[in-house]
Amino acid sequence: MSRKESRVQAFQTLFQLEMKDSDLTINEAISFIKDDNPDLDFEFIHWLVSGVKDHEPVLDETISPNLKDWTIARLLKTDRIILRMATYEILHSDTPAKVVMNEAVELTKQFSDDDHYKFINGVLSNIKK
């Protein structure tokens, strides 16, 4: 399966891990999707999910200066997760930033409010510079 589908699953895993009552480990959360989606790139999903969780404070420090009149805490959970995922991938992978940004915009269109993709694109454009 494609990286796009793997990013969707990574997003959903991170969303699940952010639930207030979640005691799940990363491996447990990922194991729930393996049975239904055996063809996904689980190495990539684990890399992205664990990277975002392990580097969350640094990612937030990178994102925050690019949030005009917003704070990380005020963002929708979906937008916060997508920004963290994309920022991590831009900073720590060989995937072109343009590809990562496009995938983040598509995730935002799928999982967030209607026009938030413009906000996500703007923030990531500033981070990529």
From Swiss-Prot:
Annotated Gene Ontology cellular components are: cytosol
Q: Does the keyword Transcription apply?
A: yes
Any Gene Ontology biological process: transcription antitermination
Q: Where is the signal peptide?
A: none
What Gene3D superfamilies is this protein classified in?
NusB-like (1.10.940.10)
State whether keyword GTP-binding applies.
no
UniProt entry keywords in alphabetical sequence: RNA-binding, Transcription, Transcription antitermination, Transcription regulation
- One Pfam family, please name it: NusB
Molecular function (Gene Ontology), one example? RNA binding
Question: What family is reported?
Answer: Belongs to the NusB family.
The record's section on NCBIfam families has: nusB
What the protein does? Involved in transcription antitermination. Required for transcription of ribosomal RNA (rRNA) genes. Binds specifically to the boxA antiterminator sequence of the ribosomal RNA (rrn) operons.
* Name the record gives this protein: Transcription antitermination protein NusB
Name of the encoding gene: nusB
